[in-house]
Amino acid sequence: MTDPAVERDAAEAASAFSHPPVEPDTTAAYGEHPDQVIDFYAPRAAGPGPAPLVVVLHGGAWRAPYDRHHITPFADFLARQGFAVANVEYRRGSSFPHQQAEGPIAGRWPETFDDVAAALDALPALVPTALPGIDPRRMVVTGHSAGGHLALWAAARHVLPAAAPWRLPAPPPLRGVVALAPIAHFREAESRDVCGGASAQLLGGPAHFELRLPYADPAALLPTGIATTLVQGRDDIVVPPEVAEAYVDAAAQAGEMVGLTLLDGVGHFPLIDPAADACAVVSEEIAQLAW
């Protein structure tokens, strides 16, 4: 007998991935590797002033088969709501036998983190040419699933351990973060085998998990002092809502209030599906921080 939850998830994924990729207005490199690029989408609608910048970090369990192209319809959707959009690519995991994974492993340590840090650091120089007339001071970072993790991490670089090469001396210039079904709490995610143990793979395998956790787990990098909202489907079977709830609890224990919007009858993929009502909720959450 087919599990109804699995059937629903498959239908939601099929809808989210049914949209053709949307070509960007321009693309710029932030490094020499082919994956070190950012696609830029100019706002398609006028807002009350210069358009805010939304940085998008795609999901896919940090694994190589899943790149930024699957989230371009979402980037275009945001542009049609009046946002300027920067869709970031970054290096992901391929096949590394020493990590004892079947198929592509999740992430590359430290390259995945190198790239996200480098991309965010490069934006102030790239945006004036790629998106003239927008307001980079009103910048919000969003990301889905594994990209939600990276969005939270990018906003927490100023609280990384002193030895971290990505540490910033001050908070990044962000209006806030909107993380969508994020892998936000690595211990909780691993306890539920989220994406086949992807969090441990991202850190280089079980042998490195504990040592690298303070450098990579958003739940260990609190408080950030940056406005943060998580949007989560209650019926998500890919990244269950308990992962987001564990992050919110960790933030509260650190003295920080984090917003959590739980959507009834919603799974993992409608959050980035322009045809889904949940996507409009995401846009509104971003707008509340950006404008």
Positions of the model-derived regions?
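Mobile cap/lid helix-loop segments that gate and shape the active-site cleft of serine hydrolases
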Residues: 15-17, 23, 182, 187-220
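Catalytic nucleophile-loop/oxyanion-hole region of alpha/beta-hydrolase
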Residues: 65-75, 86-136
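Structural cue for short, hydrophobic secondary-structure segments
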Residues: 56-59, 87, 230
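Short beta-strand/loop motif that positions the catalytic acidic residue
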Residues: 230-232, 236
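N-terminal cap/lid segment of alpha/beta-hydrolase-fold proteins
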Residues: 2-47
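Short, surface-exposed "cap/lid" segments of acyl-processing enzymes
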Residues: 44-77
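Primarily recognizes the serine-hydrolase "nucleophile elbow" in alpha/beta-hydrolase
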Residues: 121-192
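C-terminal catalytic histidine-bearing segment of alpha/beta-hydrolase fold enzymes
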Residues: 98, 231, 242-291
